[in-house]
Amino acid sequence: SLVGSEMCIRDRTDSVAIRDEAQYYKGLNEGMLDGDAYIPAETDVSIRPSWFYHAEEDSRVKSVRELWDIYCTSVGRNSVLLLNFPPDRRGLIHSTDSLHAALLKQGIDETFSTNLLRGAKVKATNVRGAKYSPEKMLDNEKNTYFAGKDGEVKADIIFTLPKTIEFDCLMIEEVIELGHRTTKWSVEYTVDGKNWI
C-alpha cells in the first residue's frame, strides 16, 4: 500500500504480508497475518516542499530532525521510505539536500550501532528449546533467534542489565522470513526489581 500522506506520517504498524489473490484486495492497506506475499507499505516524501527543484526552496529543505521523525514514523512502523531528491538545474543534488541526508544516515548509525542489552542476562517464560533460547536475541547472529512454544501466544522476556541505562529509542525486530507473527508487545522496566512501570 502507499502511505498517501505528504506529511509522511504512518499512523500505525501493519503486517507486511498480503494474500496474493485478487479477492483479497481489501488487505492491501493493512496487510494480512496469513498472507503469502511480502508487500510492505511504501512511504513517499520529498526532502523539499515540492517534488521538483526550485531555487527558492533551498532554505526550506527538511531539517535532519524532520527527516528523523519521518524515518521513525515510516521505517519505524514497518514501511519502506522513498525519499525524493530533486536534481537542481545542473542535474545534481543540492548540497543542503545531500548534507541533511548524510546527517540523517549518521544519526541512524549512531542510534542503532550500540546494543545496550549487550552483557545483559535474559530469561523468558515460554521457550521452544535450547536452539531457540532467549540468549539468541543477544548473540548478534542473523541465523539464530528466540522462539516460544508452538500454540502459545505469550512470552514474557526479561533482560537484567549489569547497570542502569537510559535510552529514548527501542528497535525490536522479528525474523521476517518466517512471516509477520508479532501482533502485540509492551515494554516495562523496573529499577528496584519489584515495581514494574
Give each language-model segment a name.
Residues 1, 5-6, 10-151, 159, ...:
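Mature catalytic domains of secreted/periplasmic carbohydrate-active enzymes
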Residues 149-155, 164-165, 176-197:
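Trp- and acidic/polar-enriched beta-sheet ligand-binding modules for extracellular glycan
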Residues 170-171, 187:
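An aromatic-rich alpha-helical recognition segment common to small helix-rich domains
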